[in-house]
Protein backbone atom coordinates (compact mmCIF):
# COMPACT_ATOMS: atom_id res chain seq x y z
CA UNK A 1 0.00 0.00 0.00
CA UNK A 2 1.48 3.33 -1.06
CA UNK A 3 1.78 6.20 1.40
CA UNK A 4 -0.29 9.37 0.76
CA UNK A 5 1.43 12.36 -0.83
CA UNK A 6 1.99 14.48 2.29
CA UNK A 7 1.67 18.26 2.46
CA UNK A 8 5.41 18.57 3.07
CA UNK A 9 6.08 16.50 -0.03
CA UNK A 10 3.65 18.60 -2.06
CA UNK A 11 5.41 21.76 -0.96
CA UNK A 12 8.85 20.37 -1.80
CA UNK A 13 7.61 19.20 -5.19
CA UNK A 14 6.19 22.61 -6.11
CA UNK A 15 8.13 24.86 -8.43
CA UNK A 16 7.98 27.76 -6.02
CA UNK A 17 6.68 29.07 -2.72
CA UNK A 18 4.07 31.83 -2.40
CA UNK A 19 4.11 33.23 1.13
CA UNK A 20 1.13 35.34 2.19
CA UNK A 21 1.31 37.49 5.32
CA UNK A 22 -2.11 37.52 6.97
CA UNK A 23 -0.94 40.06 9.53
CA UNK A 24 -0.04 42.49 6.74
CA UNK A 25 -3.47 41.98 5.19
CA UNK A 26 -5.11 42.78 8.52
CA UNK A 27 -2.86 45.82 8.93
CA UNK A 28 -3.81 47.17 5.51
CA UNK A 29 -7.51 46.76 6.23
CA UNK A 30 -7.22 48.41 9.65
CA UNK A 31 -5.13 51.28 8.29
CA UNK A 32 -7.79 52.15 5.71
CA UNK A 33 -10.71 51.56 8.06
CA UNK A 34 -9.20 53.77 10.76
CA UNK A 35 -8.37 56.58 8.36
CA UNK A 36 -11.83 56.82 6.77
CA UNK A 37 -13.92 56.14 9.90
CA UNK A 38 -16.81 56.44 10.60
CA UNK A 39 -17.35 55.27 7.02
CA UNK A 40 -17.68 51.49 6.96
CA UNK A 41 -14.90 49.65 5.15
CA UNK A 42 -15.71 46.57 3.10
CA UNK A 43 -13.18 44.19 1.53
CA UNK A 44 -13.19 43.17 -2.11
CA UNK A 45 -12.27 39.47 -2.21
CA UNK A 46 -13.29 38.58 -5.76
CA UNK A 47 -11.16 36.28 -7.93
CA UNK A 48 -10.28 34.18 -4.87
CA UNK A 49 -9.10 37.27 -2.97
CA UNK A 50 -7.06 38.48 -5.95
CA UNK A 51 -5.51 35.04 -6.25
CA UNK A 52 -4.32 34.77 -2.65
CA UNK A 53 -7.00 32.41 -1.33
CA UNK A 54 -10.33 33.85 -0.19
CA UNK A 55 -10.91 31.11 2.38
CA UNK A 56 -7.83 32.32 4.29
CA UNK A 57 -7.79 36.00 3.38
CA UNK A 58 -11.43 36.88 4.09
CA UNK A 59 -11.30 35.52 7.68
CA UNK A 60 -8.18 37.64 8.24
CA UNK A 61 -10.12 40.74 7.19
CA UNK A 62 -12.99 39.62 9.43
CA UNK A 63 -10.58 39.42 12.38
CA UNK A 64 -9.56 43.00 11.60
CA UNK A 65 -13.19 44.12 11.86
CA UNK A 66 -14.54 43.72 8.33
CA UNK A 67 -18.15 42.59 8.02
CA UNK A 68 -18.85 43.44 4.35
CA UNK A 69 -17.32 41.35 1.55
CA UNK A 70 -17.65 41.90 -2.19
CA UNK A 71 -17.15 39.21 -4.84
CA UNK A 72 -17.88 39.22 -8.56
CA UNK A 73 -20.00 36.08 -9.01
CA UNK A 74 -22.66 34.31 -6.98
CA UNK A 75 -20.62 31.10 -7.05
CA UNK A 76 -17.75 32.91 -5.33
CA UNK A 77 -20.07 34.09 -2.57
CA UNK A 78 -21.56 30.64 -1.99
CA UNK A 79 -18.08 29.10 -1.81
CA UNK A 80 -16.81 31.72 0.64
CA UNK A 81 -19.83 31.80 2.95
CA UNK A 82 -18.80 28.76 5.10
CA UNK A 83 -15.53 30.49 5.99
CA UNK A 84 -17.20 33.58 7.44
CA UNK A 85 -19.30 34.04 10.55
CA UNK A 86 -23.06 34.70 10.36
CA UNK A 87 -22.75 38.45 10.92
CA UNK A 88 -20.71 38.88 7.73
CA UNK A 89 -22.52 40.02 4.59
CA UNK A 90 -21.57 38.94 1.08
CA UNK A 91 -22.35 41.07 -1.99
CA UNK A 92 -22.24 40.02 -5.66
CA UNK A 93 -20.89 42.85 -7.82
CA UNK A 94 -21.98 41.41 -11.17
CA UNK A 95 -25.54 40.97 -10.03
CA UNK A 96 -27.49 37.87 -10.94
CA UNK A 97 -27.99 35.79 -14.04
CA UNK A 98 -31.64 34.88 -14.76
CA UNK A 99 -32.62 31.80 -12.79
CA UNK A 100 -30.15 32.33 -9.93
CA UNK A 101 -32.27 34.76 -7.90
CA UNK A 102 -33.83 32.09 -5.66
CA UNK A 103 -30.45 30.59 -4.78
CA UNK A 104 -29.08 34.02 -3.91
CA UNK A 105 -32.01 34.79 -1.62
CA UNK A 106 -31.87 31.34 -0.03
CA UNK A 107 -28.16 31.78 0.78
CA UNK A 108 -28.72 35.24 2.28
CA UNK A 109 -26.38 36.86 -0.24
CA UNK A 110 -27.04 40.40 -1.47
CA UNK A 111 -26.88 41.10 -5.21
CA UNK A 112 -25.74 44.37 -6.71
CA UNK A 113 -28.51 45.16 -9.18
CA UNK A 114 -26.93 46.70 -12.27
CA UNK A 115 -29.80 46.99 -14.72
CA UNK A 116 -33.53 47.48 -14.77
CA UNK A 117 -33.92 43.86 -15.84
CA UNK A 118 -32.03 42.65 -12.76
CA UNK A 119 -34.17 44.92 -10.57
CA UNK A 120 -37.35 43.51 -12.12
CA UNK A 121 -36.20 39.90 -11.67
CA UNK A 122 -35.30 40.49 -8.01
CA UNK A 123 -38.60 42.26 -7.36
CA UNK A 124 -40.51 39.41 -9.01
CA UNK A 125 -38.91 36.93 -6.62
CA UNK A 126 -39.78 39.19 -3.70
CA UNK A 127 -43.41 39.17 -4.83
CA UNK A 128 -43.44 35.37 -5.03
CA UNK A 129 -41.91 35.09 -1.57
CA UNK A 130 -44.23 37.73 -0.13
CA UNK A 131 -41.46 39.83 1.40
CA UNK A 132 -39.02 42.60 0.54
CA UNK A 133 -35.58 41.39 -0.49
CA UNK A 134 -32.35 43.27 0.29
CA UNK A 135 -30.02 44.36 -2.49
CA UNK A 136 -27.62 47.08 -3.58
CA UNK A 137 -28.43 49.33 -6.52
CA UNK A 138 -25.61 50.41 -8.83
CA UNK A 139 -25.64 53.53 -11.02
CA UNK A 140 -23.38 54.26 -13.96
CA UNK A 141 -21.82 57.65 -13.22
CA UNK A 142 -19.20 57.59 -15.94
CA UNK A 143 -17.46 54.24 -16.30
CA UNK A 144 -19.97 52.80 -18.81
CA UNK A 145 -19.45 49.29 -17.47
CA UNK A 146 -22.15 48.33 -14.98
CA UNK A 147 -25.05 50.16 -13.38
CA UNK A 148 -28.37 51.75 -14.23
CA UNK A 149 -28.25 54.47 -16.86
CA UNK A 150 -29.88 57.83 -16.23
CA UNK A 151 -32.89 56.77 -18.33
CA UNK A 152 -33.24 53.50 -16.42
CA UNK A 153 -33.07 55.39 -13.14
CA UNK A 154 -35.89 57.70 -14.27
CA UNK A 155 -38.01 54.68 -15.19
CA UNK A 156 -37.26 53.04 -11.86
CA UNK A 157 -38.35 56.09 -9.88
CA UNK A 158 -41.61 56.14 -11.82
CA UNK A 159 -42.35 52.54 -10.77
CA UNK A 160 -43.20 52.92 -7.09
CA UNK A 161 -44.48 49.35 -6.86
CA UNK A 162 -41.21 47.93 -8.15
CA UNK A 163 -39.16 49.94 -5.68
CA UNK A 164 -41.40 48.93 -2.79
CA UNK A 165 -40.46 45.26 -3.23
CA UNK A 166 -36.74 45.81 -2.69
CA UNK A 167 -34.92 46.80 0.48
CA UNK A 168 -32.10 48.90 -1.01
CA UNK A 169 -29.20 48.82 1.45
CA UNK A 170 -26.81 51.02 -0.55
CA UNK A 171 -26.73 52.96 -3.77
CA UNK A 172 -23.31 52.43 -5.30
CA UNK A 173 -21.17 53.44 -8.24
CA UNK A 174 -17.56 52.87 -9.27
CA UNK A 175 -14.76 55.32 -9.98
CA UNK A 176 -13.04 54.83 -13.33
CA UNK A 177 -10.00 56.94 -12.40
CA UNK A 178 -9.87 56.69 -8.61
CA UNK A 179 -6.15 55.87 -8.69
CA UNK A 180 -5.41 59.18 -10.47
CA UNK A 181 -5.99 61.94 -7.87
CA UNK A 182 -5.66 64.75 -10.38
CA UNK A 183 -8.09 63.35 -12.93
CA UNK A 184 -11.12 65.62 -13.38
CA UNK A 185 -13.30 62.58 -14.12
CA UNK A 186 -13.38 61.81 -10.38
CA UNK A 187 -15.10 65.09 -9.56
CA UNK A 188 -17.56 64.59 -12.42
CA UNK A 189 -18.51 61.15 -11.14
CA UNK A 190 -18.85 62.49 -7.61
CA UNK A 191 -21.19 65.22 -8.84
CA UNK A 192 -23.33 62.71 -10.72
CA UNK A 193 -23.48 60.43 -7.69
CA UNK A 194 -24.50 63.31 -5.43
CA UNK A 195 -27.25 64.34 -7.86
CA UNK A 196 -28.61 60.79 -8.01
CA UNK A 197 -28.65 60.49 -4.24
CA UNK A 198 -30.61 63.73 -3.96
CA UNK A 199 -33.46 61.84 -5.64
CA UNK A 200 -33.15 58.98 -3.14
CA UNK A 201 -33.03 60.84 0.18
CA UNK A 202 -31.47 59.14 3.20
CA UNK A 203 -30.26 56.16 1.17
CA UNK A 204 -26.74 55.04 2.23
CA UNK A 205 -24.17 55.17 -0.56
CA UNK A 206 -20.82 53.73 -1.64
CA UNK A 207 -18.46 55.14 -4.26
CA UNK A 208 -14.82 54.84 -3.17
CA UNK A 209 -12.63 51.97 -4.32
CA UNK A 210 -8.98 51.73 -3.19
CA UNK A 211 -7.99 54.92 -4.98
CA UNK A 212 -11.17 56.65 -3.89
CA UNK A 213 -10.29 56.21 -0.23
CA UNK A 214 -7.35 58.57 -0.84
CA UNK A 215 -9.33 61.27 -2.66
CA UNK A 216 -10.86 62.92 0.40
CA UNK A 217 -13.90 62.68 2.65
CA UNK A 218 -16.40 63.77 0.01
CA UNK A 219 -15.81 60.45 -1.75
CA UNK A 220 -16.27 58.24 1.32
CA UNK A 221 -20.08 58.31 1.79
CA UNK A 222 -21.29 55.45 4.03
CA UNK A 223 -19.33 52.46 2.74
CA UNK A 224 -15.98 52.16 0.95
CA UNK A 225 -14.88 49.01 -0.84
CA UNK A 226 -11.09 48.90 -1.27
CA UNK A 227 -9.53 46.07 -3.20
CA UNK A 228 -5.94 46.29 -4.43
CA UNK A 229 -4.78 48.46 -1.51
CA UNK A 230 -5.68 45.66 0.88
CA UNK A 231 -3.27 43.41 -1.00
CA UNK A 232 -0.28 45.67 -0.55
CA UNK A 233 -0.42 47.87 -3.64
CA UNK A 234 -0.46 51.64 -3.29
CA UNK A 235 -3.05 52.62 -5.93
CA UNK A 236 -1.09 55.74 -6.84
CA UNK A 237 2.10 53.75 -7.56
CA UNK A 238 0.69 50.95 -9.67
CA UNK A 239 0.93 52.90 -12.93
CA UNK A 240 4.47 54.17 -12.25
CA UNK A 241 6.54 53.07 -15.24
CA UNK A 242 9.54 55.28 -14.40
CA UNK A 243 13.04 53.85 -14.31
CA UNK A 244 13.73 51.28 -11.61
CA UNK A 245 15.88 53.51 -9.36
CA UNK A 246 13.31 56.30 -9.29
CA UNK A 247 10.56 53.74 -8.76
CA UNK A 248 12.31 52.07 -5.83
CA UNK A 249 13.24 55.39 -4.21
CA UNK A 250 9.68 56.68 -4.30
CA UNK A 251 8.31 56.17 -0.81
CA UNK A 252 4.65 55.16 -0.60
CA UNK A 253 2.42 57.94 0.64
CA UNK A 254 0.21 55.52 2.52
CA UNK A 255 0.85 52.99 5.29
CA UNK A 256 0.26 49.96 3.09
CA UNK A 257 2.41 46.89 3.67
CA UNK A 258 3.39 44.30 1.06
CA UNK A 259 1.55 41.05 1.74
CA UNK A 260 3.39 38.42 -0.29
CA UNK A 261 6.74 37.02 -1.27
CA UNK A 262 7.36 34.63 -4.14
CA UNK A 263 10.37 32.38 -4.55
CA UNK A 264 11.19 29.71 -7.13
CA UNK A 265 13.28 26.55 -6.98
CA UNK A 266 16.37 25.96 -9.07
CA UNK A 267 16.15 22.79 -11.15
CA UNK A 268 19.47 23.00 -12.98
CA UNK A 269 22.72 24.99 -13.00
CA UNK A 270 25.10 24.73 -15.94
CA UNK A 271 28.03 26.45 -17.64
CA UNK A 272 27.74 27.49 -21.28
CA UNK A 273 30.28 28.74 -23.78
CA UNK A 274 30.33 31.92 -25.81
CA UNK A 275 27.79 31.72 -28.62
CA UNK A 276 25.40 29.36 -26.81
CA UNK A 277 21.75 30.21 -27.38
CA UNK A 278 19.23 30.13 -24.56
CA UNK A 279 15.54 29.24 -24.74
CA UNK A 280 12.98 28.97 -27.50
CA UNK A 281 13.98 30.82 -30.64
CA UNK A 282 17.53 31.36 -29.39
CA UNK A 283 16.71 34.97 -28.54
CA UNK A 284 19.62 35.20 -26.09
CA UNK A 285 23.18 34.49 -27.20
CA UNK A 286 25.97 34.20 -24.62
CA UNK A 287 28.61 36.86 -25.24
CA UNK A 288 31.18 34.84 -23.33
CA UNK A 289 31.49 31.87 -20.97
CA UNK A 290 28.72 32.11 -18.38
CA UNK A 291 26.82 30.17 -15.75
CA UNK A 292 23.05 29.87 -16.06
CA UNK A 293 20.33 28.45 -13.81
CA UNK A 294 16.86 27.25 -14.72
CA UNK A 295 14.04 27.75 -12.23
CA UNK A 296 10.82 25.75 -12.10
CA UNK A 297 8.23 28.45 -12.84
CA UNK A 298 7.04 30.04 -16.06
CA UNK A 299 4.18 31.83 -17.72
CA UNK A 300 1.75 29.17 -16.49
CA UNK A 301 2.59 30.47 -13.01
CA UNK A 302 1.95 34.16 -13.68
CA UNK A 303 5.48 35.08 -14.81
CA UNK A 304 4.47 36.40 -18.19
CA UNK A 305 6.35 35.82 -21.45
CA UNK A 306 6.90 39.58 -21.63
CA UNK A 307 9.59 39.10 -18.95
CA UNK A 308 11.76 37.36 -21.56
CA UNK A 309 15.25 38.92 -21.69
CA UNK A 310 13.90 41.67 -19.45
CA UNK A 311 12.98 40.74 -15.88
CA UNK A 312 15.08 39.35 -13.05
CA UNK A 313 15.20 37.25 -9.91
CA UNK A 314 17.33 37.87 -6.82
CA UNK A 315 19.56 35.75 -4.63
CA UNK A 316 20.32 37.82 -1.58
CA UNK A 317 21.22 41.26 -2.90
CA UNK A 318 22.41 39.93 -6.25
CA UNK A 319 20.22 40.58 -9.28
CA UNK A 320 19.96 37.62 -11.65
CA UNK A 321 18.71 38.72 -15.09
CA UNK A 322 16.21 36.59 -17.00
CA UNK A 323 17.79 35.44 -20.25
CA UNK A 324 15.98 33.89 -23.18
CA UNK A 325 12.27 33.45 -23.49
CA UNK A 326 10.09 32.59 -20.52
CA UNK A 327 8.70 29.07 -21.05
CA UNK A 328 5.47 27.63 -19.72
CA UNK A 329 7.14 25.90 -16.78
CA UNK A 330 10.65 27.34 -16.58
CA UNK A 331 12.78 30.48 -16.72
CA UNK A 332 16.53 30.74 -17.24
CA UNK A 333 18.69 33.16 -15.25
CA UNK A 334 22.21 34.51 -15.68
CA UNK A 335 23.92 33.57 -12.40
CA UNK A 336 27.50 34.25 -13.50
CA UNK A 337 27.82 36.96 -10.83
CA UNK A 338 27.40 34.40 -8.03
CA UNK A 339 30.34 32.31 -6.79
CA UNK A 340 30.41 28.81 -8.23
CA UNK A 341 28.39 26.41 -6.10
CA UNK A 342 26.18 29.10 -4.57
CA UNK A 343 23.09 27.79 -6.34
CA UNK A 344 22.27 24.11 -6.60
CA UNK A 345 19.30 21.85 -7.22
CA UNK A 346 16.50 22.98 -4.89
CA UNK A 347 17.93 26.43 -4.08
CA UNK A 348 15.37 29.23 -3.86
CA UNK A 349 15.59 32.58 -5.64
CA UNK A 350 13.38 35.59 -4.96
CA UNK A 351 10.90 36.72 -7.62
CA UNK A 352 8.75 39.01 -5.46
CA UNK A 353 9.96 40.25 -2.10
CA UNK A 354 12.11 42.89 -0.42
CA UNK A 355 14.37 43.34 -3.47
CA UNK A 356 11.63 43.36 -6.09
CA UNK A 357 8.04 44.30 -5.33
CA UNK A 358 4.99 43.16 -7.22
CA UNK A 359 4.80 46.59 -8.86
CA UNK A 360 8.31 46.11 -10.26
CA UNK A 361 7.39 42.80 -11.87
CA UNK A 362 4.24 44.36 -13.31
CA UNK A 363 6.28 47.22 -14.71
CA UNK A 364 8.70 44.81 -16.37
CA UNK A 365 5.68 43.05 -17.91
CA UNK A 366 4.16 46.34 -19.10
CA UNK A 367 1.01 45.58 -17.13
CA UNK A 368 -0.63 46.31 -13.78
CA UNK A 369 -0.17 44.49 -10.44
CA UNK A 370 -3.76 43.19 -10.58
CA UNK A 371 -2.93 41.07 -13.61
CA UNK A 372 0.20 39.54 -12.10
CA UNK A 373 -1.44 38.92 -8.72
CA UNK A 374 -4.51 37.14 -10.10
CA UNK A 375 -2.41 35.07 -12.52
CA UNK A 376 -0.05 33.50 -9.97
CA UNK A 377 -2.06 30.29 -10.10
CA UNK A 378 -2.30 27.23 -7.89
CA UNK A 379 0.96 25.40 -8.61
CA UNK A 380 2.92 27.16 -5.88
CA UNK A 381 3.25 25.85 -2.36
CA UNK A 382 1.24 28.38 -0.36
CA UNK A 383 2.37 29.36 3.11
CA UNK A 384 0.26 31.68 5.27
CA UNK A 385 2.19 33.49 7.99
CA UNK A 386 1.79 36.25 10.57
CA UNK A 387 5.09 38.05 9.99
CA UNK A 388 4.07 41.57 10.92
CA UNK A 389 1.86 40.43 13.75
CA UNK A 390 4.11 37.76 15.22
CA UNK A 391 3.03 34.22 15.92
CA UNK A 392 3.62 31.05 13.99
CA UNK A 393 3.18 30.30 10.33
CA UNK A 394 0.70 27.83 8.92
CA UNK A 395 0.87 26.04 5.61
CA UNK A 396 -2.13 25.90 3.29
Curated annotation (Swiss-Prot):
Chain sites annotated for binding substrate: 145, 328
Alphabetical list of InterPro entries matching this protein: Ala_racemase (IPR000821), Ala_racemase/Decarboxylase_C (IPR009006), Ala_racemase_C (IPR011079), Ala_racemase_N (IPR001608), Ala_racemase_pyridoxalP-BS (IPR020622), PLP-binding_barrel (IPR029066)
Biological process annotations from GO: D-alanine biosynthetic process
Reaction(s) this enzyme catalyzes, per UniProt: L-alanine = D-alanine
Superkingdom, natural source: Bacteria
Active site location: 46, 280
Cofactor(s) essential for the protein: pyridoxal 5'-phosphate
One Pfam family this sequence matches: Ala_racemase_C
GO CC term, one of those recorded: cytosol
Residue(s) carrying N6-(pyridoxal phosphate)lysine: 46
Pathway(s) this gene product operates in, as recorded in its UniProt entry: Amino-acid biosynthesis; D-alanine biosynthesis; D-alanine from L-alanine: step 1/1
Enzyme class: isomerase
Keyword Kinase: no
PROSITE patterns: ALANINE_RACEMASE
Record EC number: 5.1.1.1
GO molecular function: alanine racemase activity; pyridoxal phosphate binding
Keywords: Isomerase, Pyridoxal phosphate
Family, similarity comment: Belongs to the alanine racemase family.
Function: Catalyzes the interconversion of L-alanine and D-alanine. May also act on other amino acids.
Official protein name in the record: Alanine racemase
Organism of this sequence: Brucella canis (strain ATCC 23365 / NCTC 10854 / RM-666)
Gene, per the UniProt record: alr
Amino acid sequence: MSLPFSQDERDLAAGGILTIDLAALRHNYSAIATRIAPTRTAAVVKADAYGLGASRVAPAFYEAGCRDFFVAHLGEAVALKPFLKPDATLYVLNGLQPGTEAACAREGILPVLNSLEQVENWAALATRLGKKLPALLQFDTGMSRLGLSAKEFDRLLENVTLLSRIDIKFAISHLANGDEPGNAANARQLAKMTALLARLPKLPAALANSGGTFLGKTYYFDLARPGIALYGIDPERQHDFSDKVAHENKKPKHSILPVLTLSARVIQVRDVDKGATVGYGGTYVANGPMRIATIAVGYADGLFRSLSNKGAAFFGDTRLPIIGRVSMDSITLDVTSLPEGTLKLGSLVELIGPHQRLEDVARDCDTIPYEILTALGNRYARVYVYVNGGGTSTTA
